[in-house]
From Swiss-Prot:
Its EC number is 1.-.-.-. Trichothecenes are sesquiterpenoid toxins that act by inhibiting protein biosynthesis. Pfam families: FAD_binding_3. It comes from Stachybotrys chartarum (strain CBS 109288 / IBT 7711) (Toxic black mold). FAD-dependent monooxygenase; part of the satratoxin SC1 cluster involved in the biosynthesis of satratoxins, trichothecene mycotoxins that are associated with human food poisonings. Satratoxins are suggested to be made by products of multiple gene clusters (SC1, SC2 and SC3) that encode 21 proteins in all, including polyketide synthases, acetyltransferases, and other enzymes expected to modify the trichothecene skeleton. SC1 encodes 10 proteins, SAT1 to SAT10. Its cofactor is FAD. This is FAD-dependent monooxygenase SAT1.
Amino acid sequence: MWASFPRPEAIPPGYVGETQHQHRSIMLLNGKSRSWIFLYERLPAPSHDRVKCIAEDVIEFADSFADWSIWNNTKLEDVVDHSTAGMSNLEEGIVKNFSHGRIVLVGDACHKFTSNAGLGLNNGIQDIVAGCNSIRKVVTESGFDLPDVKALEATFKTYYEMRLGPFNDDFIHSKMMTRMQAWANTWYFLFTRYLFFIFSEWILFRFTMLRRVCTGLVLTMHLAKSRLVALLNGFIRSGYHSFIWISAIRPCNDQLLNQLLAGAIQIEILCSLNTWRISSCRAPLLLVFDQARG
C-alpha cells in the first residue's frame, strides 16, 4: 500500500525512514512539503493471480499498521490519508521476449522489480536510453530509407543483450532488499539488524552504486529545442523523405515560422554534396548546416 500526505513538522525534509518487522515493513520518504509512505506485507505464498483492491481493502490494511511508529513518536495513524492511498500486489519477474517485429518493450513492461530499492524506475530510464540509441544507430545506417523489420529485429536483439546483465543484477538486489526489510528468514534478519549498515556504507554506496552511476548510459543524439524543428520534422516525415533533423535552428520570429509552415516545402537530398536544399518554397530560404560536420 502507498499513500501521500503533507509532511509532518516533526519529520525533517529529505530524510528516509524504515520500520521493520517479521514479514512486514514500512518505508517513509520525505520531501519539502509532502511525504510518501509504503506499507509492505509478505504474502503466504507466491501468486500469479490478478488482484484488484477496493477502498475497504486499503483501509483495513492501513489499520493493521496503525500503531506502528514511522518516525520517533509519530505513528502511522497520525498521518495516513486514505483518500490519497492505493494498494496492489508487488510483482517481480523478467519476460523472455523483449521485442517482436517492430515492437520493443522497456521498463515494467518487460521486467518488474519490487519497489523497495527504487531500481525499477532507474532501469526503465536506462532501457529507454539504450533503445533510443539503438534505434538512432539503425536509422542513421539506413541512409534515406526506413529500416526494415529485419534490421529492427537485429537492433532490438542488441538492445536486449546490452540490458540483460544490468537488470538481472538489479533484479537480484531489489529482491534481496525487499526480503531483508521484511525479515524473510533468520539470515535476512541478522544481516539487516547487525551487518547491513556497514555493508551499505562501505560497499553498496561507495563502490557498487557509484560504479553503476558512472557507467550509466546517456543519449547519443541531439534533442531539437526549436518549435520550428519539431513541426518541420513532423511535416517532412509525412511527405517526401524521412530523416533525423539534428540542427536546432530557432526562427527569428513567429511571422517567419508561419511563412515556413504555410509554404509548399519540398526537400531534395543532394547526396553528392551531402547537404539539404529547400525548393518550391514561398517562404524565405532556410539554410541548414550539419552540426556534426561543422
